Design a protein with these regions (language model features):
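Helix-loop-helix "hairpin" substructures at the membrane interface of multi-pass membrane proteins
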Residues: 166-245
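Extracellular/periplasmic helix-loop junction at the C-terminal end of a transmembrane helix
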Residues: 126-164, 195, 313-316
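Residue-level recognition of pore/gate-forming positions within transmembrane alpha-helices
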Residues: 27, 46-47, 75-76, 97-101, ...
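Cytosolic-side transmembrane-helix boundaries in multi-pass membrane proteins
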Residues: 1-28, 146, 196, 203-205, ...
Length: 330
């Protein structure tokens, strides 16, 4: 039996990781080529939220409309931590993630008691309830005025180093580290045996149950994992804008994340990142040019749903497959 050579091992490693390395390189240059750093930061953090939702919908077939609840709770938990508990950067991020994960456990437990449209409607009901609580409990959330006075902490390890994160660019690259690490973890999940079971549940839940898998448990787990990473995106976003508002628990955020996944191509992981780039960038440019810019976004979404169901990533893969075919003819 032939043993793998170092060169073949390296080739395999490169095939496995070149997409993530390319993704990291692209996001590393975004702040320098986009009009302003805030736009690059928004694209990156919504790309993380979209990738987390793609794990739920694209890989497990779990549809939900409570993405904004996880993202927004991450925003609020980080904001309240910095305002009332501590100025520790990692504590704010950790509590944002913990709050969203806790909510995901509750919603996931309830939503997985039903299937199909009933499960989706339960997530929508929870999302509306969270929004109503945030709106009415103005003493805690600031209501329609939001929470202001949030100060972005610096990155400090006592006795080792301190990095000033007040610069938008410095904070972008701080978030960039979390983004790449989180994306890598999500990708490894999709390639793991756990990820294979999720895909089996997506394709045929009854068959997965018949061979012994507890499909409800797997769907609950993917709810929690998705909630963790959406909460992480929300916590990082809060410390960038230094503001928390009920807009971030509004259904519009959930709708935007769904659009990002379907536009980019669900079940691809890289597609939703591409979708986030297109949706956030197009929203920013179109809103500056036309008051009715949402019509453009709606038209774009309809086009991809009707004529390009594989999304942008599907179109990209088709173009790549066409290149060798042309080479063979020559």
């Amino acid at each position: 039996m032939a043993t793998p050579t170092p060169s073949s091992s390296f080739s395999q490693w490169w095939r496995d990781y070149r997409a993530i390395l390319t993704l990291a390189a692209l996001f590393a240059v975004f702040p320098f080529i986009l009009p302003y750093t805030a736009l690059a930061n928004e694209i990156m953090l919504f790309a993380l939220a979209a990738a987390a939702f793609d794990l739920c919908l694209g890989y497990a077939g779990v549809m939900m409309f409570c993405q904004a609840s996880f993202f927004g709770l991450g925003v609020y938990a980080a904001a309240l931590t910095l305002l009332h508990l501590t100025s520790n950067l990692f504590a704010a991020i950790g509590l944002g993630v913990l709050a969203s994960a806790s909510l995901a456990i509750v919603i996931g437990f309830m939503a997985t008691t039903r299937s199909g449209s009933y499960s989706v409607l339960l997530t929508l009901a929870f999302a509306e309830m969270i929004y109503f609580i945030a709106f009415q409990w103005s003493g805690l959330t600031g209501g329609d005025n939001g929470l202001t006075g949030i100060k972005r902490p610096n990155l400090e390890i006592p006795g080792f180093f301190s990095i000033n994160l007040q610069s938008s660019l410095a904070y972008y690259f701080f978030s960039f580290v979390f983004f790449i690490a989180a994306f890598y973890i999500i990708r490894r999940i999709t390639l793991s045996p756990f990820g294979k079971v999720l895909m089996a549940v997506r394709e045929n839940e009854q068959r997965a149950q018949a061979i012994g898998y507890n499909t409800r448990l797997y769907k609950m787990l993917v709810f929690v994992i998705g909630g963790i990473f959406m909460g992480l995106a929300g916590a990082l976003y809060c410390m960038y804008i230094c503001f928390a508002h009920i807009h971030y628990v509004h259904f519009e955020i959930s709708g935007n994340i769904v659009m990002m996944v379907l536009t980019g191509g669900m079940g691809t992981l890289f597609g939703p990142v591409m979708g986030a780039f297109i949706i956030v960038l197009a929203s920013d440019l179109a809103s500056a040019l036309w008051d009715r810019w949402m019509l453009i976004m709606g038209g774009l979404f309809i086009f991809f749903v009707l004529f390009a169901r594989g999304g942008l990533w599907g179109l990209f893969e088709k173009l790549l497959k066409m290149r060798p075919a042309r080479g063979k003819k020559n």
